Each structure stands twice: as C-alpha cells, then as structure tokens.
Amino acid sequence: MKKLVLLSAFVLLAFQVQADSIQNTDEEIKTEEQPGEENQAVSISFGDPEGYALQDAAIRRARRCPPCPSCLSCPWCPRCLRCPMCKCNPK
C-alpha cells in the first residue's frame, strides 16, 4: 500500500514539473512576440480614390454594347447614350 502511495505521489510530482516547464516556455514565447514601438503603427494602402476612378473608366471603355440593329456603323448601342453621332440615339 505504501508503494502505491509513493508511486502515485511520484507520478503527480512528475506531471506538475512537466506542467510548470510548459507554462514557463509559454510565458517566454509571449514576451518574445510583443512588438516594439517602431512596429506598432503600420498602414498599408493599395490605391487611392483616383485609382478607383481610373479603373472604373477602363472597365467602361472595355465594355461596349453590341451595334444597334438600325445603325450598324455605330459601335455603341443607342441605349448607352454615348454616341452623339448615331442617328438612332434617342435624346
């Protein structure tokens, strides 16, 4: 019976030592990962509002309507209201 108690105490002591060592390494990792003052304020910008306007204009230029059936020489559809020279463009 005494052997069982001593063995249990020894196993519990081993688990406690192992848990303490894991806790210490976790605390060391947390202190190493804290950023310095120079790394705290970082802003990243991938464009500005003017860039968005240029992208929108490029998309609009690339998207053309099919020629309207009454005016095959006009590359714009009369519904787009972009071709002022088209006679089929309702104004």
UniProtKB/Swiss-Prot annotation:
The keyword Signal applies. This is Alpha-defensin-related sequence 12. One of its GO terms (cellular component) is extracellular space. The keyword Repeat applies. Belongs to the alpha-defensin family. Sequence repeats lie at residues 65-67, 68-70, 71-73, 74-76, 77-79, 83-85. Paneth cells of the small bowel. It is found in: Secreted. It comes from Mus musculus (Mouse). Residues 65-88 are annotated as: 6 X 3 AA tandem repeats of C-P-X. Keywords: Antimicrobial, Defensin, Repeat, Secreted, Signal. Residues 1-19 form the signal peptide. The gene is Defa-rs12. Residues 20-65 form a propeptide. Apparent precursor of a secreted, cationic, proline- and cysteine-rich peptide that contains Cys-Pro-Xaa repeats. Unlike cryptdin, the proposed mature peptide region lacks the structural motif characteristic of defensins. It may have microbicidal activities. GO terms for biological process: defense response to bacterium. It holds the Pfam family Defensin_propep. Coiled coil: none annotated.
